[in-house]
Amino acid sequence: MTTTNRLRIALQKKGRLSKDCNELLKQCGVKINWNEQRLIAYAENMPIEILRVRDDDIPGLVFEGVVDLGIIGENVLEEEELGRLARGEKIEYKKLRTLDFGGCRLSLAIDRDRTYNGVQDFVNSRIATSYPNLLKRYMNEKGVAFKSTLLNGSVEVAPSAGLADAICDLVSSGATLEANGLKEVEVIYQSKACLIQRAEPLSAEKQALVDRLLTRIQGVQQAAESKYIMLHAPKDKLKEITALLPGVENPTILPLANDSARVAMHVVSQENLFWETMEQLKEMGASSVLVLPIEKMLA
C-alpha cells in the first residue's frame, strides 16, 4: 500500500514508452522537474510522485499496491498476468484506458530466405523470445508444440547464433528484423500503452486527481485525433457537408456579410482522409476551407 499523500505513478525509466509518457504528462499540464540521475520525481503543480522503473516491474508495483497508477505496454502487462496466473498468484488491478502511443506487435520471424507455409512450420522448432507466456498461449491455441528459448535482449541474433530456429519479438517498423536477415511471418499480439490503477480504492483526494488526469488525457487524445475546420458553405448543401464532416458536436453556423446564399461553418471533426474530404467539399461548393490542429480539447 502507498503511504504518501501524493498520487504515485510508475513510468518506464528508459525505453520506447519513456519519452511518450513524459510528453503526455506535459500535455496534461503536469509540470515535473526531471533529473536523469534520480528515480523519483515530483510534480511542481500537483501532488504527484513519479517512480521511474523498469517496464517489467510496473505491473507488479500496481498489482501489489506499491503505486497508484502505472503506464505500461499491454504486451508487458499481459505477459506478467499470464506468468502470475500460471503460478497461481492473485492479480487485481483496473485498466483505465488505452493510450494512443506505444503501438507495436509481437510477431514470429524466421530467416528471410526460408519458405513459410503457415504456423505449423513451427512444430518442434526452437523459438527465442522475451515473451514466453504470450508465445505459449498463442501456440497452444494453434495446437503447435515447440521449445521456447528465453532471451531478455538481442533476440534477433538468436537464429544466426544457432540459439533458435525462429524468434518471437516486438516489431514496430520491421527494420531491425530486416537488418538481421529475418522476415515477419505471424503477428501473435497487438499492443499499445495503457494506463492501469491498483485495485484497492484510493482516498477521495487521490481518486479526484485520477479523474482529473483521465479527463485531461481524453482531451489530449481527442485533440490529437481531431482537426478544427472552418469553411464557407452554400446553405443548400449544409446537410451534405455536415454528413461529410462527422463532428464531436453539431457544427457552428454563422452568417456571412453581404452573402445570403452562403454561411460560415466551424466544426471539430475526426475525419482522417482529409485531402479526399477537401476535394469533396470543393465539389459541394465549399470555399475558404481551413484545417487547423487542436492543442487541447474538452468535449
From Swiss-Prot:
The keyword Metal-binding applies. It comes from the Bacteria. Pathway: Amino-acid biosynthesis; L-histidine biosynthesis; L-histidine from 5-phospho-alpha-D-ribose 1-diphosphate: step 1/9. Belongs to the ATP phosphoribosyltransferase family. Long subfamily. PROSITE patterns: ATP_P_PHORIBOSYLTR (PS01316). The gene is hisG. NCBIfam families: hisG, HisG_C-term. InterPro entries: ATP-PRT_HisG_long, ATP_PRibTrfase_cat, ATP_PRibTrfase_CS, ATP_PRibTrfase_HisG, HisG_C, N-reg_PII-like_a/b, N-reg_PII/ATP_PRibTrfase_C. Feedback inhibited by histidine. Keywords: Amino-acid biosynthesis, ATP-binding, Cytoplasm, Glycosyltransferase, Histidine biosynthesis, Magnesium, Metal-binding, Nucleotide-binding, Transferase. HAMAP family: HisG_Long. It is found in: Cytoplasm. Pfam families: HisG, HisG_C. It comes from Actinobacillus pleuropneumoniae serotype 7 (strain AP76). Its main location: cytoplasm. The keyword DNA-binding does not apply. Catalyzes the condensation of ATP and 5-phosphoribose 1-diphosphate to form N'-(5'-phosphoribosyl)-ATP (PR-ATP). Has a crucial role in the pathway because the rate of histidine biosynthesis seems to be controlled primarily by regulation of HisG enzymatic activity. Its EC number is 2.4.2.17. It catalyses: 1-(5-phospho-beta-D-ribosyl)-ATP + diphosphate = 5-phospho-alpha-D-ribose 1-diphosphate + ATP. GO terms for cellular component: cytoplasm. GO terms for molecular function: ATP binding; ATP phosphoribosyltransferase activity; magnesium ion binding. This is ATP phosphoribosyltransferase. GO terms for biological process: L-histidine biosynthetic process. Its cofactor is Mg(2+).
